[in-house]
C-alpha cells in the first residue's frame, strides 16, 4: 500500500460539504479540518500499481467545492 496525504483548499463556506463528500465516497482513511493555506487534510492508502496522480485527479479533485489540492507522498511511518 502507498500512503499519501492531500491538502485540500475549498471554496468559501464549502469545507464541511467537501469533508462530508469525501467521507461518503469512502476513499480517505482520515479527514481533518485544518488551519492555514488549506482547509482539509486527508489521508489515503492506494494499492501498489495505482497511479496517485490519476487517483487524486479522478477521485478527489472532481468533488464539488474543491478549488486546489496539494499531494504529499509518504515514504515510511515510524
Language-model-derived ranges and their functions:
Residues 1-78:
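A compositional/biophysical signature of low hydrophobicity enriched in polar/charged and small residues
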Amino acid at each position: 500500500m502507498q500512503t499519501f496525504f492531500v491538502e485540500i483548499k475549498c471554496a468559501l463556506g464549502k469545507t464541511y460539504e467537501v469533508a462530508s463528500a469525501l467521507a461518503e465516497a469512502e476513499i480517505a482513511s482520515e479527514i481533518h479540518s485544518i488551519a492555514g493555506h488549506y482547509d482539509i487534510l486527508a489521508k489515503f492508502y492506494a494499492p501498489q500499481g495505482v497511479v496517485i496522480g490519476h487517483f487524486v485527479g479522478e477521485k478527489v479533485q472532481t468533488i464539488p467545492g474543491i478549488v486546489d489540492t496539494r499531494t504529499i507522498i509518504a515514504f515510511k511511518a515510524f
